[in-house]
């Protein structure tokens, strides 16, 4: 049975196609403290996810990362020794592509969060650009997060880890995830030989290609980083109109079909 690495800490969700478990960055190295000013730690009720600051008031993450009493931490590198410019916010509003966040469909695992008040840009806090065009196959992209660094054990690092992976042919993911539609609004990315991957706790974090957020960590295999088992990312480019409409104040905007 295919396991979905719905990358939130032991967060088990019922999907419309299959049930799977979550994961984090495996096979990477500690990120440079200055290379992730847009990276957000999203947490609630003992669960953690990643997120991406796209402007001073808005964050992108995965729909399955939603929960009560959510907090978002900005300007964070070490969780135990925070930067002086760290900031914490809570959601003011949340927007989803689905009527229920508990039933995640391929390509609709996306949540747009409006913060209770804007963050202040600083040395370790700055937004990441939205995509100007979709990434092509074989593009080398970056993944990052505070997720577990072991494919089989829950070993959560104090600092975020980063790794480079590549955009793969959609058919590679369809071979492992039979419910994935040919034209779903997702990206397939990973390393075919295995060894580098997102893992538990990395859900909602960014897939960064050419300095832009192209994907949101959604689904993967269990255990993480297995050969020929890439992960699935919600494709941000296909949701640009929805994202921009919501931010502009059109809260009734609908997601692409």
UniProtKB/Swiss-Prot annotation:
The keyword Plastid does not apply. PROSITE patterns: TRYPSIN_DOM, TRYPSIN_HIS, TRYPSIN_SER. Belongs to the peptidase S1 family. Snake venom subfamily. CDD domains: Tryp_SPc. GO terms for biological process: proteolysis. Keywords: Disulfide bond, Glycoprotein, Hemostasis impairing toxin, Hydrolase, Protease, Secreted, Serine protease, Signal, Toxin, Zymogen. It comes from Trimeresurus stejnegeri (Chinese green tree viper). It is found in: Secreted. The keyword Signal applies. Residues 19-24 form a propeptide. Disulfide bonds join 31-162, 49-65, 97-255, 141-209, 173-188, 199-224. Pfam families: Trypsin (PF00089). GO terms for cellular component: extracellular region; secretory granule. This is Snake venom serine protease KN3. GO terms for molecular function: serine-type endopeptidase activity; toxin activity. Its EC number is 3.4.21.-.
């Amino acid at each position: 049975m295919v396991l979905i690495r719905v990358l939130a800490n032991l967060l088990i969700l019922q999907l419309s196609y299959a049930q799977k478990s979550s994961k984090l960055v495996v096979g990477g190295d500690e990120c440079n403290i200055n290379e992730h000013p847009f990276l957000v730690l999203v947490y609630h009720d003992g669960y953690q996810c990643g997120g991406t600051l796209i402007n001073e008031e808005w964050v992108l993450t995965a729909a399955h990362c939603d929960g009560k009493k959510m907090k978002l931490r900005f300007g964070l590198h070490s969780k135990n020794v925070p930067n002086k410019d760290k900031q914490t916010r809570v959601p003011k509003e949340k927007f989803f592509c689905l009527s229920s966040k508990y039933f995640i469909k391929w390509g609709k695992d996306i949540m747009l969060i409006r913060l209770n008040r804007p963050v202040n840009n600083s040395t370790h806090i700055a937004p990441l650009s939205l995509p100007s065009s979709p990434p092509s196959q074989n593009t080398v992209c970056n993944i990052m997060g505070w997720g577990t660094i072991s494919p089989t054990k829950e070993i959560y690092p104090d600092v975020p880890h980063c790794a480079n992976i590549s955009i793969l042919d959609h058919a590679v993911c369809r071979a492992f995830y039979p419910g994935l539609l040919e034209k779903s609004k997702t990206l397939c990315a990973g390393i075919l030989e295995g060894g580098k991957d997102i893992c538990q706790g990395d859900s909602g974090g960014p897939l960064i290609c050419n300095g832009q957020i192209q994907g949101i960590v959604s689904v993967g295999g269990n255990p993480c980083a297995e050969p020929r088992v890439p992960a699935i990312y919600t494709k941000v480019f296909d949701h640009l109109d929805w994202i921009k409409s919501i931010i502009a104040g059109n809260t009734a905007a609908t997601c692409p079909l």
